[in-house]
Every structure is written in C-alpha cells, then in structure tokens.
C-alpha cells in the first residue's frame, strides 16, 4: 500500500510541470517541433554588394521569405521595442531577435537628409498632364513627369540600387540554447502562444521527464525572460550562444560569471547597439566562457535579455546635423534595465508583464455565433479543416484577437510605430525593406 501511494505521488509530480493547459485558453499552438534547418538564414545566400561590406547576406527584398518555418510556425512575442520569434526545436531552441530602431543604411546622399525635404511645391498643375498621359496610355511619360515634378532634390531611387537610399530594418541576430536532447523518444510536444497572457510555451516529455519552457517580453521592464524547467531535478544542461547580425562589427565580453555583453556597430552607418544577457540557475553549475553561458545539472534556468541602440526619437530634427537622431547610450540603458530586472526574479517580472498586457488585451472580447471553443486541436489542423469548408467560428475569433495581440506586441508608447512586419524580422534585409508605408488603396 505504501508503495502504491509513493507511485501515485510520483505520477502527480510528473504531471505538475504541465499542470497548466495553455491550449485551453485563447491560443495558437502546434504539436510538432521545428528544426534548426534555416538558422542564420543570411549565410545561405548571395554575397552583399554594399560598398565596404563583404560578409554574406540575403537581400530578401521579395515577397518570399527564405525561412518559411520562421514565417509560418514561430511564436512572435514583443513589447513594442524588443521582438523575438520562438522556434521551439527540442535539440536547441532558436530565437530570432529584434530591436525596433536597429536600422541599416541611411540617406545616402552627399547633400544630407535635408535634401529630401527640398521638393517642388509648385507642381500641382502637372497632375493634369500626368492624368492625360495615363488616359493616352503613355505610362512612360506619366512616370517621367512624376519623377521630375514630385520628387525632392535627391534623384529618384532605383529598387535595385546598392545601397538602397533609405536603408532598411535589420535583424539583431539569433540566440541558440542547446539542450543536449533529441526528438527520439519524445512525446506530447506542444508549442503554444497564449494570447491571454502574451506568453510563449514549449512543452514535451522525454525519457520520463516533463520539460517546459516559458518566454515573454515585458513592456514594464524592457526585458525578454526565458525559463527552462522540468518536473525532475538536475535535468537542465544548456549552452546559450549568440549569432550576431552579419553586417555589423562587434565584441562579446563577459559580465561576471553569469552575464554577457555584446557591443557592436552596423557596418555601413555605424549605428551602435548593445545586447545584454544574464543567467541564473537553481542547482547545478553555471559557467561563462568563450561568449557562451553553460549550465550543467540545474533544476531551473532563467535567461534575461535586453537590448538598445543609440537612436533617439527627435520630433524637431535639424536635417543638416548627421547626428540628429543619435543621443542614447545603449550601454547605460541596457545596464539599468538588466540590473532592475535581475533583482525582481521570474515571478515578479511575469506578474508585472501580465498586469500591463491584460489591461490592454482584455478591453475587447469577441464571440461569433455564441460558439466558444468546441474542440481543442492544433492551429494548423484548424486551418486545414477551414480550407475544406468546415465552419470554425473560434478560428475567426482567434484570427481577430491575434491581430490585436500583434499590434500590442509591436507598438507601444515611447517608441516608433509598428513597421511592415510589426517588430519581427529574421534577416539582414527584407520585403519592401521592412520599412514604413502609408496604406495603398489597392490593399484596402
């Protein structure tokens, strides 16, 4: 009887780490893991043509992202400044990382940025000629009239010019967390994005151990928090590493026995940025060597990540000043954020994060046809069924709420608005430079 009681306790303990079923709430989830096949996608393409840069990159200036898994199966999290995509592979977690103000390139004109504002203010009457050219089917004349009369002193840009005149949003690199595990013998895999709490979760069972990872980016503390845990002690054997943006030059330094600081500048415009990483472990050992944080035999591990650039928002810039948008010391800002976040710990960070996020997300609820969630299946299966004509009002509710989630995660007070991809990108360059556009009428 005593033995049966002990086995029952062990069984309950084995389930405790997965006690919360995040798929039951408003969530997007998958039941198969991703792989590392497209990690650091920029190294698999053509060489860069920008003057002074020789490192490999992919321009990615088409509508097709070369990393299809990142685009369709990763879990996006963000706080309006920092963004990350969680891939959720078992062998090694891959996290693409972004900071909204990291911008590659610039005006690229000897006259300076002010030249862009020197436009022909007496061009309205030319509109009649342009319209008539279109009516006559003379698109070439319409284009030439537009370029000549509705442009600044800076020559009209060519889509394929190198460097592109206005530059582009660019990745801040990728993080990898090697686990020493494999998918052999793995079961009950789930990769979940909880829209209710802006929390990403990875869960699976392996060799009788229930593993769980949690990820969120806090607006209140400007830090990404990552937690690895299991239902049995001593199971966390991890190596945390960083792959930097390939068109930047930087240096990784240790910060005590549990921290890393990467300081860099983009190669073409010298924008400075800093990334700070901090680790804490319950049990086991933690070492810091060769730009990597290694954990052995820990019960639980917390990684904190924050970043910043030298960009300063300026609503009244002097365009003759090349430093009009420079004014932040990213080494100082990131040090303050990291110190404050590390002092709080996981629970306090998540509580503040959830309270802030829920105050926005919970303003709106949506119920279509009084449906509710009638079945609990992975999101790809929902989409597959929907394409076959099966009604799914919950999927439509989820789609609407996912849009709200993405905007909250990519646009918050105190920073730039969301760009064409919100705040998330996995490459050096991207479709339409991942920049800022007014909405075209054809897209409405």
Where are these regions (language model features)?
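Aromatic-residue-lined binding/catalytic grooves and analogous aromatic/hydrophobic interfacial grooves
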Residues: 20-441
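Bacterial Sec-dependent N-terminal signal peptides
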Residues: 1-20
């Amino acid at each position: 009887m005593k033995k049966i009681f002990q086995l029952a306790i062990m069984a309950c303990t084995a389930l405790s780490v997965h006690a919360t079923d995040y798929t039951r709430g408003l969530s997007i989830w998958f039941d198969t893991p991703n792989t590392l096949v497209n990690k650091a996608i920029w190294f698999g393409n053509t060489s860069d043509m920008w003057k002074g840069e020789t490192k490999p990159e992919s321009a990615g200036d088409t509508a097709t992202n070369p990393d299809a898994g990142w685009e369709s199966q990763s879990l996006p999290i963000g706080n309006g400044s920092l963004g990350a995509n969680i891939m959720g592979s078992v062998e090694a977690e891959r996290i693409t990382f972004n900071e909204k103000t990291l911008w590659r390139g610039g005006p690229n004109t000897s006259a300076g940025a002010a030249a862009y504002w020197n436009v022909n203010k007496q061009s309205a009457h030319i509109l009649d000629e342009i319209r008539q050219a279109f009516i006559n089917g003379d698109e070439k004349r319409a284009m030439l009239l537009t370029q000549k009369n509705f442009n600044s002193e800076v020559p009209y840009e060519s889509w394929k010019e190198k460097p592109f005149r206005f530059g582009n949003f660019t990745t801040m690199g990728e993080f990898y967390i090697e686990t020493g595990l494999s998918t052999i013998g793995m079961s009950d895999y789930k990769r979940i994005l909880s829209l209710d709490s802006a929390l990403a979760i990875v869960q699976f069972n392996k060799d009788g151990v229930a593993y769980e990872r949690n990820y969120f980016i806090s607006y209140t503390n400007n830090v990404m928090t990552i937690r690895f845990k299991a239902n049995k002690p001593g199971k966390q054997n991890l190596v945390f590493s960083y792959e930097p943006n390939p068109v930047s030059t930087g240096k990784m330094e240790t910060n005590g026995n549990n921290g890393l600081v990467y300081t860099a500048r983009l190669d073409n415009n010298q924008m400075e940025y800093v990334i700070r990483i901090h680790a804490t472990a319950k049990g086991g050992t933690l070492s810091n060597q060769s730009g990597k944080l290694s954990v052995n035999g820990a019960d639980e591990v917390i990684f904190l990540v924050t970043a910043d650039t030298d960009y300063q928002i300026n609503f009244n810039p002097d365009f003759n000043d090349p430093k009009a948008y420079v004014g932040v010391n990213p080494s100082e800002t990131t040090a303050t954020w990291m110190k404050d976040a590390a002092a709080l710990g996981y629970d306090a960070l998540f509580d503040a994060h959830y309270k802030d996020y829920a105050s926005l997300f919970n303003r709106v609820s949506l119920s279509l046809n009084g449906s509710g969630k009638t079945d609990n299946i992975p999101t790809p299966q929902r989409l597959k069924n929907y394409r076959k004509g099966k009604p799914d009002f919950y999927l439509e509710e989820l789609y609407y709420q996912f849009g709200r989630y993405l905007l909250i995660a990519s646009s918050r007070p105190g920073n730039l608005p969301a760009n064409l991809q919100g705040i998330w990108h996995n490459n050096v360059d991207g479709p339409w430079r991942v920049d800022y556009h007014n909405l075209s009428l054809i897209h409405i």
